[in-house]
Design a protein with these regions (language model features):
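A solvent-exposed interaction/effector surface
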Residues: 1-164
């Protein structure tokens, strides 16, 4: 279902992402100035990876309103597809708001996270914080999947408690 707000509501199955963890509790989502993140991506990109590039945000911390851990790496079909030494994050099946953008880094990421923030502020989505997923279909594109609450009909629940 395509929203008038520039995102789609979709169902996703379980997604496994293998890669390297970056612990960044003080870095706000969408902010890219983190040398640890840059080093992790450099290390991942120097290996043969088992699937499309991806990144997950896991281990949500309400006290900082962000995630403690980001896994930078690649999607894999099974645990056996992961490169030795990489950790695996599991993004559960469910209903997601899919935000997509094209362009150059870091602007493309800043635009995406601004869209998420706007959708939350406007009450268009209510996030579940069970794990966010960034997928990179090609060098200048990012698809961002945000897990959301839905009502019994499958419509997004707003942050205000209203059903849409």
């Amino acid at each position: 279902m395509r929203s008038d707000m520039g995102f789609e509501i979709i169902e996703r199955g379980e997604t496994l992402v293998a890669g390297l963890p970056v612990r960044s509790p003080q870095r706000a989502l969408g902010k890219l100035s983190d040398p640890r993140l840059d080093r992790a991506w450099t290390r991942v990109l120097h290996h043969e990876v088992g699937g499309p590039l991806a990144s997950t945000y896991i281990d949500f911390a309400p006290d900082v309103e962000s995630y403690y851990t980001q896994i930078v790496g690649y999607e894999c079909a099974t645990v056996d597809d992961a490169t030795r030494g990489h950790v695996i994050s599991r993004i559960p099946p469910g209903t997601y708001a899919k935000f997509s953008s094209r362009g150059m880094f870091p602007d493309v990421m800043l635009r995406l996270w601004a869209q998420v923030s706007e959708a939350e502020t406007n009450g268009d989505i209510e996030r579940t914080y069970t794990g966010d997923l960034e997928a990179y279909p090609h060098a200048y594109a990012v698809d961002l999947y945000i897990p959301i609450h839905v009502d019994e009909s499958g419509a997004p629940s707003s942050a205000m408690g209203e059903k849409r």
